[in-house]
Amino acid sequence: MSLNIFWFLPTHGDGKYLGTSDGARAVDHGYLQQIAQAADRLGFGGVLIPTGRSCEDSWLVAASLIPVTERLKFLVALRPGIISPTVAARQAATLDRLSNGRALFNLVTGGDPDELAGDGLHLNHQERYEASVEFTRIWRKVLEGENVDYDGKHIQVKGAKLLYPPVQQPRPPLYFGGSSEAAQDLAAEQVELYLTWGEPPAAVAEKIAQVREKAAAQGREVRFGIRLHVIVRETNEEAWAAADRLISHLDDDTIARAQASLARFDSVGQQRMAALHGGNRDNLEVSPNLWAGVGLVRGGAGTALVGDGPTVAARVKEYADLGIDTFIFSGYPHLEESYRVAELLFLHIDVQRPEQPKTGGYVSPFGEMVANDILPKSVSQS
């Protein structure tokens, strides 16, 4: 099975180490453009752009990078309760049209009550999912060209419609991640691809089975994806050393403050991430080659696959065998790690690459000329 491999735009900061400004770099437009263009050239199918008050706005970032990329798709956030579903549908169609069909959408209900209150959303966990279901029903129908009247508990629209259709028909695909039962119910009814954070394979298999069963009960099929960091090197020893370096500047106080902040979240997925390490930097390998060190101070995706290319590829295959066809990867720093993943991992997995433009001569990668007149060949050919 060919796998869709996405990269990540770190609009909330980037650097060589977690939890410190040492080794950090400015995430300005020029740097984001570097990462996006690298992902585009290396064969990643798309990039996830995060959302929230700690991030730059995902829609504006995507719009700014469309003109400087060729094939890369942009997975941007839909925020139910913060914007009207009809307005969001118009924005989605516009982004899809401006990008000539390179827009993808990620439904984000939110998990931080403090941040949501600051954005004017004062709904509890269950109410947010109720509102998200209503939002998505309207958004989908409007994008598909219907005139929509909807009288819901949280959202009411009358005569909602779209004049300029999206390029992708009947509409761009919708992605969504959530671990609660309410989230799984929403995924089963509304989305094309259900995302999970990188839990051990057995836990991921259980979630996939639950969503698949719920979708089948509604006569639907859902695809599956996973969000993971990757630390891949020439050898396993080098990869684990890189993992240790990534958290080498973290002290216990920083970890404790981060975990206290994340504890206020009502996100079930965030709670499951925190349970993998318990705020303790000992025994962070929670499953073979699955390392929970990132989650000591980072909200959201908190695990990384660690190893050499063949080892990480074997773990990717384990998840793929569960039914996952889309992998959203990242690594610190994101520019350099995009190259490492492409060069050390892509060799060992079946990557569904975007169509490449035709090139002539030696524009395709061939290495440096040997002794001025000898074309280098692959080690596998010798």
Curated annotation (Swiss-Prot):
Any one GO MF annotation of this record:
alkanesulfonate monooxygenase activity
Q: What does this protein do?
A: Catalyzes the desulfonation of aliphatic sulfonates.
Q: Which UniProt keywords apply?
A: Flavoprotein, FMN, Monooxygenase, Oxidoreductase
EC nos: 1.14.14.5
Q: What does changing V167I do?
A: In strain: Blue1
Name the chain's protein.
Alkanesulfonate monooxygenase
State the gene name recorded for this protein: ssuD
> Which reactions appear under catalytic activity for this entry?
an alkanesulfonate + FMNH2 + O2 = an aldehyde + FMN + sulfite + H2O + 2 H(+)
How changing L347P affects the protein? Answer: In strain: PSBZ and Blue1
Entry's family note? Belongs to the SsuD family.
The record's listing under InterPro entries reads: Alkanesulphonate_mOase_FMN-dep, Luciferase-like_dom, Luciferase-like_sf, SsuD_RutA_monooxygenase
Q: Which GO terms describe its biological process?
A: alkanesulfonate catabolic process
Q: Which PANTHER family match?
A: ALKANESULFONATE MONOOXYGENASE, ALKANESULFONATE MONOOXYGENASE-RELATED
Q: Which organism is this entry from?
A: Pseudomonas sp
